[in-house]
């Protein structure tokens, strides 16, 4: 018994030291300077519940007052571009990296070499210059209302090409290319999958079956369970949220059979942030279990990209494999997303109708 007690005590001490060492990596001077500033303003592109929890935990840990606003990644991009180096917020939290890359290219993000970036699972999960850092990974796919498809006598689409079938006309929802990072990822995915011209042609053909373009990337998922949307294109963790948290067990999740891409959900500091030290401390916090391990508790079921974080059990339960994805070219996306969005909208021509209104 004494030996067992000694082993347990030693293990507890070791775990305590490990926990301390992770927290202790953050420079004490940075913490002091951040507390001196006393404030932080966050634009969040993750879901509101997780955003609120992340901000509350930061306040609790450091005593720094946090103000936040939930916006889609496209809305944040537009706002930061308009403010042009004089941002009204300090940091960006959550949302796919394609809009982050555009802002980085435009010089609107602050490069910062984060200490806790050492815990990232690989170099793909950060900008090479430190403009942004990944905190999670989400798989792009389809969410379908199984009951409505059965009622209509329709098969569940299994691949991207299936979405072009005439029987799905008016049944598909996708987010707006102008406002949602998810939709920008769809553009890049199709261009990388099919080639430039064929990828744009695919999106023009897909448009014929699109009923609604939502402002936010999670918009389609929120309407599948009710039957208003029959087939939604988006991130599958948003579908898991609707099943687990909202009880919509009529939703089916589909990973396209010929391959799909993924988002890296990120965090970054805005160039010209008024609370720069608090912003840097936020990045360290966002790259720690203190922040990301609470994600699934608040309805965010993405795969985490830190080696010291606990993966959400819900993602594995639905059979999602975080490695079953195409080799996404982030550099091409960084250089060309804005151009590609313009080319798609131009190719749509008159089809770019009221469904794309952002007001």
Predicted region positions:
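Extracytoplasmic ligand-binding site segments that recognize negatively charged/polar headgroups
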Residues: 41-55, 67-83, 87-228
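Short, low-complexity disordered leader/linker segments with a strong preference
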Residues: 1-37, 354-359
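Conserved C-terminal helix/tail region of periplasmic/extracytoplasmic solute-binding proteins
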Residues: 320-359
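Mature extracytoplasmic/periplasmic domains
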Residues: 260-328
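Periplasmic-binding protein-like
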Residues: 138, 202-207, 213-214, 247-271
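Alpha-helical segments flanking ligand/cofactor-binding loops in enzyme cores
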Residues: 32, 161, 221-222, 280, ...
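A ligand-binding cleft/hinge motif common to bilobed small-molecule-binding domains
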Residues: 98-102, 230-250
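A short alpha-helix/helix-coil micro-patch that ends at or immediately precedes a cysteine
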Residues: 54-62
